[in-house]
Amino acid sequence: MTTDTATHTGETTRPSEVARPGNRTADRLFDTGIRNQWYAVCPSDFVPAGGMKRLTLLGEEWLLFRRADGSLHMLEDRCPHRGARLSLGKHLGDRIACWYHGVQVDGTGTVAAVPGLPGCNLEGKQLVAAPHLIEAGGAILAYFGDNEHPEPAPLVLPEQLTDPDVSAFLCYAEWNVNWRYAVENLLDPMHGSFLHRDSHSMSEGQTTARFRIRETERGFFFEKTDQSGVNFDWVELCRTGIDWVDLTIPYPPTAGPGGPFGIVGMATPIDEDRCAVFFWRYRRVTDWQRDTWRFLYRTVLEDRHWDVLEQDRIMLEELRSDADQAENLYQHDLGVVRVRRMYRTEAEAQARANTTG
């Protein structure tokens, strides 16, 4: 598969959950992300060879750094000595030296050296959280576990990110909205007939519909029962170690050969008020059709796709933070209710485990 990355605004490490779980109440987990699964972190090209990148993810501070050979590491952005930010320090190739006192932490979260006191008992101890990482589809993915589940959950990547007959473009953006609202928006196909009615790909079809939930081995479909292949008519929520959605929307003839385009979507919590969204826009095309699709996307279609995303961003960012506390839902919202209950149940279970563990 070929993937290009657009933005708007390696080596596997040993896991280490050194974060302080005392703040992980059910409400906190619901707002900043459940644990014990993988999340997309950022586009791979955000961290070039020899580079560092400071990030907030799931309400916590992290540091990515890449070695000259391309291998990638992620550390909690906290020096084990006095708690200073490692992201203020110096990249030493295979480790980070804290700016405050020079303490060196390698990619596994282990203290490699204490220059001010050689032989110090901190040396050789793994004291900094260092999540497992992989890179796929032009993005970095990380596993966020808790003390009871430090080893990464089994991960099955979306087939659209690994299939050689799929050509995709990664679109990345950061939105000032809670991550759950971004996920719920994807589980709400009917908004396409209204919010996106004037877009290049969602102007056709009925503005009335009935929906159903259809279970799958990896999640569930939420789909219209009276229309298919006309508009944003279905979405599948997939839980394969990482949560993602798949959907397809018909292209007009002006989009060239290759049939409908699909979207693999993910939302990663930054904190309770912000999220990072990842949308791989893909098409199953080969040979000259692949070349045509990629040319048309870059020259014509990309801006139109960003226009649709901008409509979503505006709508979601204008939602009140407590919008879900005063709703009057109806049949079209079955997908929203399903995913909301799913995450609430998992947040409560993980909070109980943190308390009893």
Q: For the regions a protein language model found, what residue spans apply to each?
A:
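Non-catalytic accessory segments flanking enzyme active sites
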Residues: 27-28, 33-35, 195-197, 207
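C-terminal catalytic domain of Rieske-type non-heme iron oxygenases
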Residues: 3-5, 71, 148-357
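Short, charged, low-hydrophobicity "junction" segments
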Residues: 10-11, 251
